[in-house]
Amino acid sequence: QLTMSFEKVFEIAPIFRAEPSRTNRHLSEAISIDFEEAYVDYNDVMKRIEQIINQVILSMQEFSKDNHDVDFVIPVILDTIPQYTYADLLEKIQATGAKSQWGDDLYPAQLSKIGITGFYFIKDWPIGPKPFYVKVSKDNPKISESFDLMYGDLEISSGSTRIEKKSELEDRMKNKGMKIDTFSYHLNVFDYGVPPHAGCGIGLERLMMALTGIENIRDTTFYPRDVDRLTP
């Protein structure tokens, strides 16, 4: 909504979620890097993410020149991050014997079996599992203009082209069984005209895991908070 006034909007801020998972990659409190940009689509957002990751890698390389006790391998600058469609990877997963069907999520255990390493994008997801504000593809109504950034089987970011029309948002909400009246505070803004826009959220702790080789997300933050720990 802020793209009505500001063409580019970003924030780096805490996020909180009632996360029930006890794994090495889930926290109940984390830092998210979020940005939204007007007059772009999800392809532009993926390019922005490439730029962000390469800038971080460049900063790590510069830091390591004066700090020789860095105990992990500094990544190399990426020419480009590979892109796979959801359909491509679903086919590969099914070839391993999995019973996954169109519209199912792609789980870490399944992704690890197909052996893709490093950073890559999974794009053009089915519309079903994606949030109500994600735009439907112009070419195929079953597909959304969305992506996930992965590192091996670890999800780092999710993003999409966003819906900018109120009527389209309301239709999507109805299809998902949502009560439109409870979202009036969100929908009313669209009466004043929202530009076409796209954006994403990047999990900082998970990005640090990918760039440093740290295997447990709790080691990327001073005070990890999860399903079992609230303080400090």
Per-region residue spans from a language model:
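A residue-level signal for conserved active-site and pocket-lining positions in enzyme catalytic cores
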Residues: 5, 35, 89, 122, ...
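Metal-assisted phosphate- and nucleotidyl-transfer catalytic regions
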Residues: 46-152, 174-195
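A glycine-rich, aromatic-flanked flexible loop/lid motif
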Residues: 21-29, 137-147, 161
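A generic structural motif
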Residues: 34-45, 153-155
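Class II aminoacyl-tRNA synthetase-like tRNA-binding/catalytic domains
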Residues: 1-38, 188, 209
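Active-site pocket scaffolds in enzymes
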Residues: 160-161, 166-232
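Active-site lining segments that contact anionic ligands and/or coordinate catalytic metals
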Residues: 7-9, 30-32, 116-119, 144-146, ...
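Hydrophobic/aromatic-lined pockets within catalytic cores
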Residues: 2-3, 7, 17-21, 53-61, ...
